[in-house]
UniProtKB/Swiss-Prot annotation, chain A:
Organism annotation: Gallus gallus (Chicken)
Gene3D superfamilies: Crystallins (2.60.20.10)
One Pfam family it belongs to: Crystall
The protein's role, per its UniProt record: Crystallins are the dominant structural components of the vertebrate eye lens.
Segments for region (Disordered): 1-21
Stretch list, region N-terminal arm: 1-23
Domain description: Has a two-domain beta-structure, folded into four very similar Greek key motifs.
Subunit text: Homo/heterodimer, or complexes of higher-order. The structure of beta-crystallin oligomers seems to be stabilized through interactions between the N-terminal arms.
The protein's name: Beta-crystallin B3
Region (C-terminal arm): 200-211
Swiss-Prot/TrEMBL keywords: Eye lens protein, Repeat
Region entry Connecting peptide, spans: 109-113
Curated annotation (Swiss-Prot), chain B:
PROSITE patterns: CRYSTALLIN_BETA_GAMMA
Family: Belongs to the beta/gamma-crystallin family.
GO biological process: lens development in camera-type eye; visual perception
Native organism: Gallus gallus (Chicken)
Purpose of the protein: Crystallins are the dominant structural components of the vertebrate eye lens.
Domain notes: Has a two-domain beta-structure, folded into four very similar Greek key motifs.
Protein name: Beta-crystallin A4
SUPFAM superfamilies listed in its UniProt record: gamma-Crystallin-like
Gene designation: CRYBA4
Residue numbers spanned by region N-terminal arm: 1-11
Signal peptide: none
Amino acid sequence: MTEQQSPPEQMVTGEGAGERGGNYKITIYELENFQGRRCELSEELPNVVDKALEKVGSIQVESGPWLGFERQAFAGEQFVLEKGDYPRWDSWSNSHNSDSLMSLRPLQIDSPDHKIHLFENAGYTGRKMEIVDDDVPSLWAHGFQDRVASVRALNGTWVGYEYPGYRGRQHVFEKGEYRHWNEWDANQPLMQSVRRVRDQQWHQRGSFENS
Amino acid sequence: MIQRRRPSSGLWKIVVWDEPFFQGKRHEFTTDCYSTPERGFSTVRSFRIESGAWVGFEHCGFQGQQFVLERGEYPCWEAWSGSNAYHVDRMSSFRPITCAVHGRSQLLLFEQENFQGRRGELSDDCPSLPALGWGGSAVGSFLVCSGAWVCSQYPGYRGFQYLLESDTHAGEYKHVREWGSHAQTGQVQSIRRVQQ
């Protein structure tokens, strides 16, 4: 196989679009059920209005994952968008406050391994819970209650939720340190479930072996 | 330790309130509730699961939309409903899920009804079937080998939920009709194990 030479000026300049061998492709539609004006994206979009869409009414993720935001410039409530069809706003948002999705960006997938440390108090203090390669629909079942105030995402990409069973406001944890809940844009340290974000275009582990 | 007459009675406990945010009339249940109105609750608007996994239903008699409920606090309807399009702010019956074994769950899914067509096997959670290689956004039938599972219309466990149990009709869910009274299509894009 001959590798194509790519001139240095065309190299991706680390904006974090996850250019590590995978593709990102998403189609946003102005109306519900994949109707109306549409726009195909393969990189981040700070404001859907820039693409002449007034709003986002439905979404098809062809390869991802992506992260949507309630407001432009990647602000406000977060919505994890994994490969699949999202025909209406309530298929990605659990918040009755807002049906708005105004910006979106590719979501980094770090490694096939997943490890996260949750702490009861800010600054990585108080009781600690380690989760390795598993999803936890109720932190209560593991001795925690409803309070998580700081997080270390050691490997992988994770998403935490206010309520058990992956309900309520979502907060994404990309590999990194989150000393205080305001670093994940929460207004209170409330988290009752947490899960991994996985996709076979990045890592085959856990994929279907169809027969 | 006091020996209980019913050894299972400590395994499931739900505390319910008839107002949101744990307000109003309160009651504890450790077994099935076929109809909350018959127990003096016109509806349940907040609750706490103290032990075990439960399934709640929109209507009396375990009918209508299903809500899988694991340990934790559910102060308002958006904490248990995954679908805002069909707004359900109440729960009128509920029962324990007795077969949940989170770590040892196994499920077979089939492209067509009656266990026909392409087959896939799961023993771990799957927040997006398309992302993990299931071609398409629908499932025709399920065979639950062990544990309890919940599948959802949309990725990330959103939309209508369908509970699949290994101890209900031998774990066989041959047709959409058998998934629940609210099931209209075979659209399924995420599946996960229920945690006891």
